[in-house]
């Protein structure tokens, strides 16, 4: 049987980090087994579902590189199908109409709570065999078995079972003809021939109800795998403040999609002590039943380390487009400065994110805005002008502007003046960047460009003369 997995987000919000991990695990399981990965948009919550959220989910999936093997399935385009299946259950005596008012249902709930029982529908309409009538309270309820147990072997959690007496007759179709969650997903997974249902463990309590529906429909039962939660760094439930953000906010923060994928896969799965995987290695090695049953903790420092690894090792040509995007987000005209690939080579060892890289790269694309006064006091003081003037003369006279020629000019300055290279590099570093920290000084000057470098040296000389 061909493995078919699905990711089924609800477009009531954007794709968050937990959803992205679920999608990744579904994708990897299907790819390893040469199966199919499908996408379903569960958009039946008409009040909260938005097209903007749908677009954002699709965009995030594309950014992460999680391709799917058929056009997305939209639940709102399948309302007729849900009604057909509900009608079949009615005809077979496996479901029934109920017309209980909200007040009646609230009274049932309150009565159960007063006696310390679990709130549940009391089955008042189960045996009444009520006919269809036009009523705003009309729902269709599933006749859940009263006896026996529901048991299944979860690929992650192990054996799970529950007595049917713990379950009530759930609503499967609302008054407006829209399905409830538990009904829709069973019909969808059946029609989509899903073989493995991989989802968060917040759905475990839904699974016994869904299994009873599968049995009632005579549908083949998929295998279930319920993923543990992702907690924040303190072990609490994730919030937007602690990491449960829209996946695209990680892009905006400067993380690479393959770095995020590499990090996410390790939140619950491992292959020995190996930390870094390319995508093909993940496809070859990942197995859903190897996922840990315990909750994982988000570790932003580890994500930063993984991202930095790829910044250091990826081909600069592949990093250039996302760096350009980050520079443009800062209002920078990239054509006004050095090649992005050169910037990457200069900064890749010094930053963890592309956002940091873009911030540090501003010195090569924008006029120097300010000086670090501590750096000025330490390095732009009387006497420093000699080295700056000599370096300026040699830089201005270079036949071609290359990093090697710039380096030679600076070393020649130190040799000629019989001073250490630091006596040349540090005043020049402050003149060019406004600070006393930068990449290799020759590379820093080279990326600034001849005209702009000379202009900044002149400004530093004026600053020294007026100190």
UniProtKB/Swiss-Prot annotation:
CDD domains for this protein: GluRS_core (cd00808)
Subunit structure comment from the entry: Monomer.
GO cellular component: cytosol
Pfam families in the cross-refs: Anticodon_2 (PF19269), tRNA-synt_1c (PF00749)
Entry-linked HAMAP family: Glu_tRNA_synth_type1 (MF_00022)
UniProt keyword ATP-binding present: yes
GO BP of this protein: glutamyl-tRNA aminoacylation
Chain location of the short sequence motif 'KMSKS' region per the record: 237-241
Compartment(s) of residence: Cytoplasm
GO MF annotations in UniProt: ATP binding; glutamate-tRNA ligase activity; tRNA binding; zinc ion binding
Protein name: Glutamate--tRNA ligase
Function text: Catalyzes the attachment of glutamate to tRNA(Glu) in a two-step reaction: glutamate is first activated by ATP to form Glu-AMP and then transferred to the acceptor end of tRNA(Glu).
Protein species of origin: Xylella fastidiosa (strain 9a5c)
Family membership: Belongs to the class-I aminoacyl-tRNA synthetase family. Glutamate--tRNA ligase type 1 subfamily.
EC number: 6.1.1.17
Positions that bind ATP: 240
Residues spanned by motif 'HIGH' region: 9-19
């Amino acid at each position: 049987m061909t493995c078919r997995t699905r990711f089924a987000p609800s477009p009531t919000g954007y794709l968050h980090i937990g959803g992205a991990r679920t999608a990744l695990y579904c994708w990897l399981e299907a790819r390893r087994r040469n199966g199919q990965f499908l996408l379903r948009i569960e958009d039946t919550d008409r009040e909260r579902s938005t097209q903007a959220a749908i677009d954002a989910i699709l965009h995030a999936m594309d950014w992460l590189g999680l391709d799917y093997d058929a056009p997305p399935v939209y639940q709102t385009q399948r309302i007729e199908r849900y009604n057909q299946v509900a009608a079949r259950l009615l005809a077979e005596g496996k479901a029934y109409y109920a017309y209980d008012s909200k007040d009646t249902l609230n009274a049932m709930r309150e009565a159960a709570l007063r006696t310390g029982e679990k709130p549940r529908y009391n089955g008042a309409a189960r045996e009444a065999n009520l006919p269809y009538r036009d009523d705003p309270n009309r729902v269709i309820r599933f006749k859940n078995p009263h006896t026996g147990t529901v048991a299944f072997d979860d690929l992650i959690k192990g054996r799970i079972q529950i007595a049917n007496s713990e379950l009530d007759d759930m609503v499967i179709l609302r008054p407006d003809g829209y399905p409830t969650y538990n009904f829709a997903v069973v019909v969808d997974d059946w029609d989509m021939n899903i073989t493995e249902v991989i989802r968060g463990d917040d759905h475990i309590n839904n699974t016994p109800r869904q299994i009873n529906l599968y049995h009632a429909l005579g549908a083949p039962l998929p295998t279930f795998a319920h993923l543990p939660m992702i907690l924040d760094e303190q072990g609490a439930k994730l919030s937007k403040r602690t990491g449960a953000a829209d996946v695209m906010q990680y892009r905006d923060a400067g993380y690479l999609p393959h770095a995020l994928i590499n990090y996410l896969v390790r939140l619950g799965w491992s292959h020995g002590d190996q930390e870094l995987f390319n995508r093909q290695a993940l496809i070859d090695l990942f197995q859903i039943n190897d996922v840990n049953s315990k909750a994982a903790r988000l570790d932003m420092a580890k994500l930063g380390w993984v991202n930095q690894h790829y910044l250091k090792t990826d081909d600069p040509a592949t990093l250039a487009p996302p760096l350009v995007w980050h520079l443009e987000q800062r209002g920078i005209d990239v054509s006004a400065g050095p090649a992005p690939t050169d910037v990457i080579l200069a900064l890749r060892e010094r930053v963890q994110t592309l956002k940091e890289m873009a911030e540090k790269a501003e010195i090569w694309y924008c006029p120097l805005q300010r000086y670090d006064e501590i750096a000025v006091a330490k390095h732009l003081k009387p006497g420093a002008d000699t080295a700056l003037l000599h370096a300026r003369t040699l830089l201005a006279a270079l036949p071609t502007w290359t990093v090697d020629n710039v380096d030679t000019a600076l070393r020649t300055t130190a040799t000629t003046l019989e001073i250490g290279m630091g006596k040349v590099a540090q005043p020049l570093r402050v003149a060019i960047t406004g600070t006393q920290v930068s990449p290799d000084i020759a590379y820093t000057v080279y990326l600034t460009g001849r005209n702009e470098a000379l202009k900044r040296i002149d400004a530093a000389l004026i600053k020294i003369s007026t100190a």
